[in-house]
Amino acid sequence: MSLVRLAHELPIEAPRTAWLDSIIKGDCVSALERLPDHSVDVIFADPPYNLQLGGDLHRPDQSMVSAVDDHWDQFESFQAYDAFTRAWLLACRRVLKPNGTIWVIGSYHNIFRVGTQLQDLGFWLLNDIVWRKTNPMPNFRGRRFQNAHETLIWASRDQKGKGYTFNYEAMKAANDDVQMRSDWLFPICTGSERLKDENGDKVHPTQKPEALLARIMMASSKPGDVILDPFFGSGTTGAVAKRLGRHFVGIEREQPYIDAATARINAVEPLGKAELTVMTGKRAEPRVAFTSVMEAGLLRPGTVLCDERRRFAAIVRADGTLTANGEAGSIHRIGARVQGFDACNGWTFWHFEENGVLKPIDALRKIIREQMAAAGA
C-alpha cells in the first residue's frame, strides 16, 4: 500500500485524512506547513547530528568505519545548524497540541545546541534520558572515552502544558514495580531488525532500535494518538506506531529511505486491543466529588455508613458531608476523626449496606466514572 504524499501537493493545513498514517515527501519545514495547528500528540525527532567529521575513520585493521557522512548531515557552520534547528522546532511547536510533548534525540555534537533552542522557543523540559548502548562502537583512535550513549530530551509544549500523557504506572509495572529511571539500556540496531539493501549495506546509517521507540510511545502516548516524526528515515517510528495502535505521520525527503520505510510499515501487523491496554494509576482517573454519588441517586441523605468491621458509623447529610460524634466534614475528614488519625481515604474506609452485604462507597465512585467515560468526559 502506498503511504507517500508529496508535500507540495498537500494544501496548507490539509485535512487529517490527507496526511494521517502517511509519509510526506519533502523538506521537513515546508512539509510541516501542510499540517493544521495543534494536530499531533507526540513528536519524536531524530535530526541531523552535524557530526563535523574531518575525514575517514579506520579500524586498527585499516578497514573503514561506516560513519554518517551523508549530505544531509553537513552544515556550513554552527550558526547554520542553529538556524535550521530553530526553524523545524518552531514548525513542530505549531502543530503540537497544547498538552503534547516532544522527544529529541542527539549526541554530544548537537544535543546541547538543540536543548538551548527548545528552551528559547518556550518548550518546557521534563526529562533528559540517557540511552546507554550495550554494544557501542569502540573509539578506534584511543584519544577519547568510548562514546557509549545518546541523549533524549523530553519536553512539553510550554510550561503550562499540564495535561501531557505520562503512563507512570505502566512504566513502573514494566520495571518490576520500581520507578522507571532516566537511564535506559538498549543495544544499537543490529541483526534482522537492521534494514539492508540488495548489496547487504545498511539502508540508513542511524536507524534507531524499535525497543527505544516502543518505550517512548508506551510512556508518553495512548492508543489512537498521532505521532509525528519530521526526520522519518527508515521508518522506525511508523513501524512501532502501527504495531502499538498509534497513528503516525512521517516527513522524509530521500526516496530510498521512503521506499524502505513503506515496505517496512506495510509488513507490520498491529497488536490487538487487549494487548494495547495501558495500565493507569488513580492519578489518571477523573476526579469524582462525593456529591456526584448523591446527585446520581446512588446514596441518599440519612444513609448510615460504617467501616468494614462496623466499629464506626456516620450519617450522610444533604450537603454531601458526613456527621459523626457531633462533628461534620468530608468523607475523608470524618473517617480520620473517628479513628483518631491525621488522614484517611474515605472512599475505601466508609461502606454502605446493600442486600445485607457491606460495600465500599468507592464502588459507587466507579459507577460515576464509568458514566463519565461513556459520556466522553
Swiss-Prot record:
<dbReference type="GO" id="GO:0006260">
    <property type="term" value="P:DNA replication"/>
</dbReference>
<dbReference type="InterPro" id="IPR002052">
    <property type="entry name" value="DNA_methylase_N6_adenine_CS"/>
</dbReference>
<keyword id="KW-0808">Transferase</keyword>
<protein>
    <recommendedName>
        <fullName>DNA methyltransferase CcrM</fullName>
        <ecNumber>2.1.1.72</ecNumber>
    </recommendedName>
</protein>
<dbReference type="InterPro" id="IPR029063">
    <property type="entry name" value="SAM-dependent_MTases_sf"/>
</dbReference>
<keyword id="KW-0238">DNA-binding</keyword>
<dbReference type="GO" id="GO:0032259">
    <property type="term" value="P:methylation"/>
</dbReference>
<feature type="domain" description="RAMA">
    <location>
        <begin position="271"/>
        <end position="373"/>
    </location>
</feature>
<dbReference type="InterPro" id="IPR002941">
    <property type="entry name" value="DNA_methylase_N4/N6"/>
</dbReference>
<comment type="function">
    <text>CcrM-mediated methylation has important cellular functions. Contributes to the accurate cell-cycle control of DNA replication and cellular morphology.</text>
</comment>
<comment type="similarity">
    <text>Belongs to the N(4)/N(6)-methyltransferase family.</text>
</comment>
<dbReference type="GO" id="GO:0003677">
    <property type="term" value="F:DNA binding"/>
</dbReference>
<dbReference type="InterPro" id="IPR040843">
    <property type="entry name" value="RAMA"/>
</dbReference>
<dbReference type="GO" id="GO:0009007">
    <property type="term" value="F:site-specific DNA-methyltransferase (adenine-specific) activity"/>
</dbReference>
<dbReference type="Pfam" id="PF01555">
    <property type="entry name" value="N6_N4_Mtase"/>
</dbReference>
<keyword id="KW-0235">DNA replication</keyword>
<keyword id="KW-0489">Methyltransferase</keyword>
<dbReference type="GO" id="GO:0005737">
    <property type="term" value="C:cytoplasm"/>
</dbReference>
<dbReference type="InterPro" id="IPR001091">
    <property type="entry name" value="RM_Methyltransferase"/>
</dbReference>
<dbReference type="Pfam" id="PF18755">
    <property type="entry name" value="RAMA"/>
</dbReference>
<keyword id="KW-0949">S-adenosyl-L-methionine</keyword>
<dbReference type="GO" id="GO:0008170">
    <property type="term" value="F:N-methyltransferase activity"/>
</dbReference>
